[in-house]
Amino acid sequence: RRGFEASKKDWIFYTDGDGQYDPSELRDLVEQLTPTIDIVNGYKMARNDNLIRKISGFAYNRILHALYLIPIRDVDCDFRLIRNSLFNKIKLESKSGAICLELVMKLKKQGAKFSEIPVHHYPRRHGQSAFFKIPNLISTLRENIKLLRKLPS
């Protein structure tokens, strides 16, 4: 959240720092920019994770699509380019993995126009996922429920 708030340029490139995405594919996001596009979101061509993460990621995305009518395929693909001016209109509050959903839903509510491109997904090179730790799962679930109440699709 602080990075979004501190940004000064017209566009914000947002990705993970664990090496699961190739930053050189940013040029592919840039090629999708038009005056009418507000966010270019990547979606994983082939998720390079273990079977449990693949199944849970698939299920999570399907559930979110059913509940929120999300305008993109892969809400948790942290490889996106976002028009900075949109952040003047929204305030991100989530402190868990729900921030991706909150970002997409609030941008959708503001009328943002989305574009998508496939991106490569690689094995994690740095750090460990904290997503499956019980406190994180509970926090994300709690924040997702709050979002469902606050931001109906």
What are these regions (language model features)?
Residues P152-S153:
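Short, charged juxtamembrane terminal tails flanking transmembrane helices
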